[in-house]
Structure formats: structure tokens, C-alpha cells
């Protein structure tokens, strides 16, 4: 991503390595880091197949990454591999496209959007995309493996299978971190947080 976490962690005094799969985003991230005087190493690579030795990191942080991966379980396995014993992964994600498979959630999402538009008829928000673009995104998301999974239940099961210890799961962090208007529009789709630790032995 644009290095939000990388910048904040680097400015807090941590040694940071940032990974992204696209060169364009990585260049944007570098530019952002430089503008804040934050020092970090930037690596162009896929999150499912990391070019690092075992036990290399004390902390892995990500936001809105796992949902759009082609091999999400492989990614979590890699993250566990490169974590040092006692290290933790903390990530934020959501069931962004579960509504494509879940009729009840789809109805809730539609109702929330209609209520939002009725309340704020002239509000211009980022989610107001052309119908053709929405359909394009939905077609892409439909084939992704996590679009049909209920999360964070899926994540908890996979992490435990990988031998990770679940430290904390927050099913909906939206009200505390999202812009109030964004949350009002999108609240049927919960943004969650997971923290898991690699055991010492």
C-alpha cells in the first residue's frame, strides 16, 4: 500500500521492510516515506511467497490485503514462517464481497446504501462508482477464494492450524477507526482486526 504503517512504524524507531506486489504502488510508498523522513526498505514481491529467511521479523502488519490474494492461506503460512518465535502478526481486513454469496448481507448492504443516499442526497463519496465499474470489481472479486468465506472465523481457523496463538480478535473495529460517514454507509460489512503470535517453542 502507500506505506501508512511503514511510515508510522519507522518514525517510531523500528526497522521496517515494506512489501507490495506492484511497482507503481511501491514507488508511491517510497515517495510518501521520503516526504515524512521515514526510513524503510521497500521490496517488490507477492505476499504469498516472501523472499526472506525463516524467523526474520518480530512483527507483520497489513491492512486490506488478505481478502484479495489468490492464495490467502499460503500467505498466512509465509507470514508465520518469517516471524521470529514470539513475534506477532496484526492485520485488518473485511468481508468486502461476501454479499455476492450471502443474500442476507446483500440485502443489509443495499438497505444501508439506500438509507445513506436518502439522508445525504448531495453527498459525493468515493463509493459512488459507475455501475459498470462496480460490476467489473464484483466479477473479479467473485472468483477470489475469500469472497465466499465468513471472516474472521476463517482466519482464526487457518491461523490455529498453522500453530499460531490467537491473541485478540475484534469483529468490528469500524466505529472506532472509520470516517463516520463511511461507517454509516458501509456498516453491514465489518472491518475486523486479528492479532496472532508465533509460539516460542
What does each model-found stretch correspond to?
Residues 45-59:
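A short acidic, Gly/Pro-enriched loop at the edge of an enzyme's catalytic core
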Residues 15, 39, 88, 165-166:
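Residues at the starts of beta-strands that form the adenosine-phosphate
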Residues 73-85:
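A short glycine-rich, Lys/Arg-flanked "PGG" loop and its adjoining helix->strand segment in the class I
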Residues 145-170:
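Short alpha-helix
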Residues 88-132:
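Conserved class I S-adenosyl-L-methionine
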Residues 162-165, 179-201:
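Core SAM-dependent methyltransferase catalytic element
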Residues 1-49:
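Class I SAM-dependent methyltransferase SAM/SAH-binding core
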Residues 58-72, 95:
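A short SAM/SAH-binding and catalytic strip from SAM-dependent methyltransferases
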Amino acid at each position: 500500500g502507500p506505506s501508512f504503517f511503514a511510515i508510522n512504524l519507522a518514525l517510531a524507531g523500528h526497522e521496517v521492510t515494506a512489501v507490495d506486489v506492484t511497482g507503481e504502488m511501491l514507488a508511491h510508498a517510497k515517495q510518501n516515506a521520503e516526504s515524512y523522513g521515514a526510513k524503510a526498505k521497500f521490496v517488490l514481491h507477492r505476499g504469498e511467497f516472501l523472499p526472506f529467511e525463516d524467523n526474520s521479523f518480530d512483527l507483520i502488519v497489513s491492512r486490506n490485503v488478505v481478502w484479495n490474494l489468490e492464495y490467502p492461506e499460503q500467505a498466512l503460512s509465509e507470514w508465520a514462517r518469517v516471524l521470529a518465535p514470539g513475534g506477532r502478526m496484526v492485520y485488518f481486513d473485511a468481508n468486502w464481497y461476501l454479499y455476492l454469496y450471502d443474500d442476507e448481507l446483500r440485502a443489509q448492504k443495499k438497505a444501508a446504501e439506500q438509507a445513506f443516499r436518502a439522508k445525504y442526497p448531495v453527498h459525493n463519496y468515493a463509493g459512488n462508482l459507475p455501475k459498470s465499474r462496480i460490476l467489473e470489481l464484483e466479477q473479479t472479486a467473485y472468483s477470489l477464494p475469500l469472497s465466499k468465506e465468513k471472516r474472521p472465523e476463517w482466519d482464526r481457523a487457518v491461523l490455529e492450524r498453522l500453530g499460531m496463538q490467537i491473541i485478540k480478535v475484534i469483529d468490528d473495529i469500524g466505529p472506532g477507526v472509520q470516517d463516520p460517514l463511511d461507517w454509516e454507509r458501509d456498516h453491514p460489512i465489518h472491518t475486523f482486526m486479528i492479532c496472532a503470535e508465533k509460539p516460542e517453542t
